[in-house]
Amino acid sequence: MIPGELVIDDGEHTLNAGRHTIALVVANTGDRPVQVGSHYHFHEVNDALSFDRAAARGFRLNIAAGTAVRFEPGQTRTVELVELGGARAVYGFQGKVMGPL
């Protein structure tokens, strides 16, 4: 293998297959753009984003790893979220959970 080389199977690949997803309407009520990364606990994103935070607890954006979604000031859009995997514990971010979900 060459450093940085990607070895990928042939065919189609489905991200997060079999995981529970939800759709939420999100509005940027602030005066600055807000960018949210692929693995950020959506419940704890910037407070300028207005949406059902309780519904987003334990979820992240359902997008490819290493990518992000940008919300421009005044913009409203629907996003798809996917449940967090692994041990289902959240530490850090804004410190709103700091333990098991």
UniProtKB/Swiss-Prot annotation:
GO-annotated molecular function:
urease activity
This protein's pathway reads: Nitrogen metabolism; urea degradation; CO(2) and NH(3) from urea (urease route): step 1/1
Q: Name one Pfam family in it.
A: Urease_beta
Q: What class does this enzyme belong to in the EC scheme?
A: hydrolase
Locations listed in the record: Cytoplasm
Q: Which domain of life is it from?
A: Bacteria
Q: Name one GO biological process term.
A: urea catabolic process
Q: Which UniProt keywords apply?
A: Cytoplasm, Hydrolase
List cellular component terms (GO).
urease complex
| Catalyzed reactions | urea + 2 H2O + H(+) = hydrogencarbonate + 2 NH4(+)
Name the Enzyme Commission number(s) assigned to this protein. 3.5.1.5
Xref: Gene3D superfamilies = Urease, beta subunit
Regarding protein family, the annotation reads: Belongs to the urease beta subunit family.
Outline the subunit composition. Answer: Heterotrimer of UreA (gamma), UreB (beta) and UreC (alpha) subunits. Three heterotrimers associate to form the active enzyme.
Q: What is this protein called?
A: Urease subunit beta
> What species does this protein belong to?
Burkholderia mallei (strain ATCC 23344)
- Give the gene name: ureB
